[in-house]
């Protein structure tokens, strides 16, 4: 059964997509079969793998709304050993579309469970918010990997994210854990990075 890792931080510009892309590529280079799922409406992971996001007929948005199957939105082998469920700006409407939907926190999990065994790793790139999309990713995932920029104010957001992970664990996904923290944009020449790292 494939290990599912959600790459999440509600703060934007901290390197979530870069982390998701590079983690997927490194695992693929080691011979692992990887599925990248882009659930960020910005679609940076989609673009990062060379997919033209504005020309897609089926994306994770259509998958979440039940308008297509996983197989219909899956793009296989965008690079060797990496397939992707892409995203684009249409996904921004998902929050509104999901209002009133029963068990909406489990939509992504229910779809991904069908193909989980086909991959060694599934990497989910989350949007820069603690939205229903991020909750879906955490409900689906085994662990959460947190990219954090090496600056003082990043720590404020980290405590909020940990609180959200704990809530999801209590109410939706009892096995969810934090995989770890990845320091991004670290510069040893800047004095604030070292105290933040400690």
Language-model features: where?
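P-loop NTP-binding core
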Residues: 1-198
């Amino acid at each position: 059964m494939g290990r599912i890792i959600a790459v999440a931080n509600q703060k934007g510009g901290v390197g979530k997509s870069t982390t998701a892309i590079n983690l997927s590529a490194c695992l693929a280079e080691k011979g692992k079969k990887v599925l990248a799922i882009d659930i960020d409406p910005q679609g940076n992971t989609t673009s990062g793998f060379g997919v033209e996001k504005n020309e897609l007929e089926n994306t994770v948005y259509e998958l979440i709304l039940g308008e297509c199957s996983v197989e219909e939105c899956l793009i296989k082998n965008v690079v060797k050993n990496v397939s992707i469920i892409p995203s684009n700006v249409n996904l921004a409407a998902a929050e509104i579309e999901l209002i009133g939907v029963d068990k909406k926190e489990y939509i992504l999990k229910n779809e991904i469970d069908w193909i989980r065994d086909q991959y060694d790793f599934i990497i989910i790139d989350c949007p820069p918010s603690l939205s229903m999309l991020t909750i879906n990713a955490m409900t689906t995932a085994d662990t959460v990997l947190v990219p954090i920029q090496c600056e003082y104010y990043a720590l404020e957001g980290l405590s909020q994210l940990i609180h959200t992970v704990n809530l999801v664990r209590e109410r939706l996904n009892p096995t969810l854990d934090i995989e770890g923290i990845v320091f991004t944009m670290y510069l040893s020449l800047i004095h604030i990075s070292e105290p933040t790292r400690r």
